């Protein structure tokens, strides 16, 4: 009964975690009620650190936020249907810049498949990004970022890649790679409420 109440009756409450608000992980805030009053205040939440803690990630590398810009063009793609026969492409290359509209932060580490057994590890890559609201551009930038920063598969055999927001990363998996993609929002919710995801 309590789980039902939390999942449905409090949906959209500013004092509970809003999974739909992960578009900009750097600006996430919770509205907190002061005990014994009707007064509320906003508190910034570090979603990156909170997520690492929730999934039990042993962090091996925590990158800084990096900004990127790019120009776009459309090219005809005969594999697409007639009504949408163009595909969005980069016009040039991905450019790293401090004030870039697209921002990424990667975290590398591992979780323990069996609690306490440090020999039974699941190697994880967590990709946080600031979304602009344009799904096609956001996903193209993620794809290009992933291609640019992918290391040799032998060096980076991740078991799981977590990423916030809708994405098409599974389409980039190469034949020798076996990683799976999980949405941060789903994994966050599952870890918080201990429910099957």
PLM regions and their residue ranges:
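Accessory, often C-terminal, charged low-complexity segments
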Residues: 1-197
